[in-house]
Amino acid sequence: DHVGSYGIVVYQSPGDIGQYTFEFDGDELFYVDLDKKETIWMLPEFAQLRSFDPQGGLQNIATGKHNLGVLTKRSNSTPATNEAPQATVFPKSPVLLGQPNTLICFVDNIFPPVINITWLRNSKSVADGVYETSFFVNRDYSFHKLSYLTFIPSDDDIYDCKVEHWGLEEPVLKHWEPEIPAPMSELTETVVCALGLSVGLVGIVVGTIFIIQGLRSGGTSRHPGPL
């Protein structure tokens, strides 16, 4: 079975924040950009198969904002409980120095859905090569979000995903740097070479013994028996 879902997310504090998304089997197909007032497809191929009028999403957002205002007044403007989000950073592909790759910052347990995610390279903010998804709804009605950073791994660079949210007392930094095998020390190299030489010598000695035994066996079998 396949599941398609669409929905709106609206939050006020104090400005209006919202989004309209459409998902299929848990994957986002498109969202409506509220500033540009246009439909943004996650893959260009999707736009060739179907279309969606962004005005429909904008109308739903307007309705959601109105309903939220009514509910806020009825609750005497009681604020929502802020949850502390959790972040994880990992590469999209196995890391090879000098080969282009993508870092992914996965932020889960977001509530309310208002968050700042920033990439840092060597403690400096990075803007180029950054892409961020809209919010995805979890089963418990919290949210998760992904931020991507295209980069070229180098042993001189370290990266951090900086997460800022009302549920955190201070920004959280999730650190990542390429894992480069430590070079062998001179002592280790000497031991490895000595072991390799020893194994080689043992092989030569054992081989020589087998050859001698084979020659002796062959010589014995060639002696003629009694007439």
UniProtKB/Swiss-Prot annotation:
Organism lineage: Eukaryota, Metazoa, Chordata, Craniata, Vertebrata
Subcellular location, principal: membrane
Example of a GO MF term: peptide antigen binding
Similarity-based family: Belongs to the MHC class II family.
Cellular component, GO annotation: external side of plasma membrane; lysosome; MHC class II protein complex; plasma membrane
Cell compartments where the protein resides: Membrane
Gene name of the encoded protein: H2-Aa
Pfam family of the protein (one): C1-set
TM ranges: 190-215
GO BP term (any one): adaptive immune response
Origin: domain of life: Eukaryota
All ranges on the Cytoplasmic side of the membrane: 216-227
UniProt-annotated stretches for the region Alpha-2: 83-176
Taxonomic source organism: Mus musculus (Mouse)
Disulfide bonding pattern of the chain: 105-161
Name of the protein: H-2 class II histocompatibility antigen, A-U alpha chain
UniProt topological domain (Extracellular) ranges: 1-189
Domain Ig-like C1-type residue range list: 85-177
Region (Alpha-1), start-end ranges: 1-82
